[in-house]
Amino acid sequence: MKKEEFLLIAKELNIKLNIVPLLFGSLGLEQRLDMYLDAEDIDVLIPEKFLNEKWQYIVNVMVDNGYALYDLHEHAFIKNDISFAYASIESLIPFAGIDISKIPIINENDIRYFLLELQDYLKVYTASSK
């Protein structure tokens, strides 16, 4: 269900805002491994300008899809116990040393999104543990 919710929002981001989001966190790892990991939420990375000066565009997409903003600081929304949070894709560079220009794009039913490779997930989880 979470993957379907991500794809629904990713499609909206692709079409309305020309954003290719990065499926991040446990749900992204679940997708990369093709293994169920019981991801608790949906974490998505997008260009930083959409977390700042263009934030209202994201809010509009989420509200139009039945989500309510519940944590502005974390850029987090909720719908039917599904938490959907945004962060900056550019933060991967200083945080984990990931070259965002080399992240592969997945095209699933004409919905485009970035998905980290396993070695990049290792960099993220290593950086998170420090």
Task: Indicate where each model-derived feature is located.
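Compositionally biased terminal segments of proteins
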Residues: M1-K130
